[in-house]
Structure formats: C-alpha cells, structure tokens
Amino acid sequence: MIQGVIQKIAGPAVIAKGMLGARMYDICKVGEEGLVGEIIRLDGDTAFVQVYEDTSGLKVGEPVVSTGLPLAVELGPGMLNGIYDGIQRPLERIREKTGIYITRGVVVHALDREKKWAWTPMVKPGDEVRGGMVLGTVPEFGFTHKILVPPDVRGRVKEVKPAGEYTVEEPVVVLEDGTELKMYHTWPVRRARPVQRKLDPNTPFLTGMRILDVLFPVAMGGTAAIPGPFGSGKTVTQQSLAKWSNADVVVYVGCGERGNEMTDVLVEFPELTDPKTGGPLMHRTVLIANTSNMPVAAREASIYVGVTIAEYFRDQGFSVALMADSTSRWAEALREISSRLEEMPAEEGYPPYLAARLAAFYERAGKVITLGGEEGAVTIVGAVSPPGGDMSEPVTQSTLRIVGAFWRLDASLAFRRHFPAINWNGSYSLFTSALDPWYRENVAEDYPELRDAISELLQREAGLQEIVQLVGPDALQDAERLVIEVGRIIREDFLQQNAYHEVDAYCSMKKAYGIMKMILAFYKEAEAAIKRGVSIDEILQLPVLERIGRARYVSEEEFPAYFEEAMKEIQGAFKALA
C-alpha cells in the first residue's frame, strides 16, 4: 500500500508527496477522515488528487493512502429505482446511516448486501463460459435482470448454486480455476465495456414529441444535444424523453443542476405508469444526483458512472437512454480542476482537452452486438447550458461537432409560450436518411416526402416573415399569405406540444403522420382554390381549420376515425367553395 502526505490543498485538488509507485486514476483515501479522491496527474513522487468530497478542514501533513484500484461501480441487481450520488453511493442508505446531510468519508456499498434475490441458473457444471455470457436471471420490477460473466473472465463451470434466494455477496457460480462469480461485479468507469461489434443506427429512438420524431429524429444508439439558455425548457424536455421514450431503461444524471429538478423526477416518476411493464416509471430508472451544491470534482465522475451503468444494461440486451443534465456543468468542473492544477487554459479558460473528453463520453453511445450475442443500445442525450444562450461558446461548439442530432432551444420561443421551444431553423439531425427505410416500412410509404414538405413550408414561411416585418402582410399575394397561414398552423397545431396534457404529452408516429397529412391536404386544396380565384379570406373562414387544430388533443384510439372524417371534410369544404 502506497502512503504519502498532503503537501498542498487547492479547493477540490490535493497535492501529495511520497506517492512513488501510485498509478493514474487510482482511488485514494485522503486525510484522517478518509475522503475519496482520484489521482489525475503524476509528477515524480508527487500525485495530484481530485477529491470527491468537501475538503474543508484538511491539513497539510495528513496521510494520503492509494488503494491501488481505479474508480469503479458495482453492477448487479438492485440499481433500478435507486438514487445515487456522483460516485455511486446510495443516498437513501446514507440518509438512514448519517441523516439528511452526507457525512464526509462515509462508506456505504452501492448495492444492498442484505436483500435476497430469486436466482434461476442458466448454466450447468462443465459449461465453458466467457465474458458477457448469461449465468442466470433474477426478476427485478418486472424486468428479467441477467447476471453476466464479467467481460474479462473466462473458464469452465465447476459448481452452480441451485435456484433459490441469495444475496449479491454469495457466490452463485464457481469456475474450475477457483474464480467465484457473484451476482454483481465491479467495472472501472473510465473504461468502456467491450462489445463484439457496433451496428449501423437504423431504428429510431422514439420520444413521443412530434418535432423531434418527425423533423429531427435520433437513432437508437445515437447521440443528441439540447443546448439552450436558462428557462428554455431543457430539463422538462429531458424529463419528457425519460417518461415517454421507447427505451427499456433510463439513466438520468443530474450533473451540477439544481436539486429541485431531481426532486421533480423523484416526485413525478413513481406516479407515472410505464407502458411496457405497467409498473411505476421509477422502476425502470436509475438516478444519479450530483447537484450544484455537491462537490465539483464528483460532477466529472457522475457522467462516467452514469454511462457505465447504461453500458451494463445494454450488455443485457436492453435499449438504454442516458440523460445528462447538463454537460456544461461537467465542463465547468473540468475547467476548475484544470485551473487548480495550473494547466495551460484554452478558449474561455476551458482546458485544451475539453473536446477530447466530450468526444470520449459521447463515443460510448451506440447500437451494438454485445459479448453475449444480444443486441443492445445506449442513446445519449446531453443538455448544454451556454451562458446567456451564446451558441458560439466552447462547450456548445465542441458538442456540435460530435453529436448526430442537435436540438436547439430558443429563449424567444419559450417567452412566446411555444413549447417544446426547439428552433426548427437552427436544429438538425444527421440520422434522417438512415431512418427513412424504417419509416417507409413501419409508418407509411410516403412519410419521408410529407416530412420534407412540412420542412420546406416552414423554411418558406421563415423567409416570408422577414418581408412581412418590413412591409406588412398586405404586400403579399394570396398564395404567399397562404404559406404564412399554413406555417402558423404547422407551428401551433403540430410542433407545439403540452408536456402536462394527458393526451398531448405523447404522440405516436401514426398520429403525427395523420396530422401532417391533414395539414398538407388542406394546403394542397387551398393552393388549387387560390389558382381558381377563391380569396384567401374565404379559405381562412372554413370550419375545417378548427378540426385540424383539435387533432392533437384526440386520443390514440379515436384518432383513426377522426382522421377519416377530417379528410372528407377538407375535400367537401373546398368543393363547396368552388
């Protein structure tokens, strides 16, 4: 065991002497209280340690002991429905042990060592096993939790525990070389879990939000960023994704944001029902709370802890969504640690390796064939909080170069009460063409063409709005006024969505397609009517416009009949005008 002494303390960074032989990213116990820290730089026998707890009261000369192990998480049954801090300490059990404030140096196992799980073996003595294979299963909240062989273990099974109830500490399989396999294993957070191979992203990550699913889709196993200034709806958008997306498991990392936002999740999710299992939504969620009043250094760890837990569920064949709220706070933590270490700053004081760290994090997303031969996916959605909504700052620009979908939130839309406040002229998705075959097969053959038509109308409307602001709407011809009116219908009746409305909070692809078809059918008929000499004012008086406006509040079950009636009414109304 390597033991040194504290030489200097600078906020969360501690510099220790006499650490010859220690390795990068080893975990240390710092000071008399044994605070958790991680070595982030070595220089001769001097180690630079970032401490994941409050360093107030530490003194020069106190001991620093290296454990020789990297920062690792415990992966096994008992994580779902859990809430952890940034280094995977269970907050619920810390509260039972020390009260509502986290005592420094407190040691609590991430997984409950007392609870018994119903084990069903899937291997027998004599079987050859290797990393990623399923040893057995455990039921957890309606899920079948697969107990996996750790990725770096292989051998022949010597004995297997019969079906029954065991704790996570009891060995359930013993290999011939004496290796004991328990229901859980540990994995270093900075190392991506290995896979057989990555697959092309060709199925959509459906969110239930029309603007995202239709105009800016993200693929299952893709990456997306939600940049936006304060109050533009980043957190509500991410919580909507966590509630309604078609992922099996959601890992929600609150990284440096307000504590009340984690409280919202803790209050709302247990009351909402998961459409797949019928149980509370909280049962498919793992929360990592590392709020703004917690130590800065643990923000960096919380992002890695979250993505490692997501990879573990992916290795079981689940599709996992990782919500990181917000990556800007993580970047600010990097900046603070970097400045304490007196490293050379780059743009706006961020360290030069900011883009590399962001890329290494987003790179861990993907749709894969796991070591066990299953298909799983991790989709990462990261919020970015640029100060003052300035999209040219380094974190936003670095993220922009990495992610596949960019959902830009706009404060001016939020102030106009247009939610989700995603700016359709400033957002993009690189997954659209890859997902078109899926849409043609599963939604409708003409779906991509309708989406492109909607997109084109919005662009034309944006161009005409500039003219209107200069000379007023009377200077436009009827055909151009029609484009502006249809653009308004698309914005208000299609892109807007109420996250708190029982029907409108979630919209299926079939319903979104139906509303698109209604709006475009109206536009086509109106365009033909204007060519025949009908005035735009007559068209805008038609009662069918109200029916299109009400479509988003019609339930999924009633929508097909409503759609048929609306299409007949549109054709009938324009025949009457002729």
Curated annotation (Swiss-Prot):
Gene Ontology annotations of biological process type: proton motive force-driven plasma membrane ATP synthesis
One GO CC annotation: proton-transporting ATP synthase complex
Sequence positions that bind ATP: 228-235
Reactions the enzyme catalyzes: ATP + H2O + 4 H(+)(in) = ADP + phosphate + 5 H(+)(out)
Pfam families (alphabetical): ATP-synt_ab, ATP-synt_ab_N, ATP-synt_ab_Xtn, ATP-synt_VA_C
Enzyme class: translocase
InterPro entries recorded: ATP-synt_VA_C (IPR055190), ATP-synth_a_Xtn (IPR031686), ATP_synth_asu-like_sf (IPR023366), ATPase_a/bsu_AS (IPR020003), ATPase_F1/V1/A1_a/bsu_N (IPR004100), ATPase_F1/V1/A1_a/bsu_N_sf (IPR036121), ATPase_F1/V1/A1_a/bsu_nucl-bd (IPR000194), ATPase_F1/V1_b/a_C (IPR024034)
Keyword field contains Lipid metabolism: no
Entry EC no(s): 7.1.2.2
Keywords assigned by UniProt, alphabetized: ATP synthesis, ATP-binding, Hydrogen ion transport, Ion transport, Nucleotide-binding, Translocase, Transport
Domain of life the protein comes from: Bacteria
GO function terms (MF aspect): ATP binding; proton-transporting ATP synthase activity, rotational mechanism; proton-transporting ATPase activity, rotational mechanism
Role this protein plays: Produces ATP from ADP in the presence of a proton gradient across the membrane. The V-type alpha chain is a catalytic subunit.
Family affiliation: Belongs to the ATPase alpha/beta chains family.
Name by which UniProt lists this protein: V-type ATP synthase alpha chain
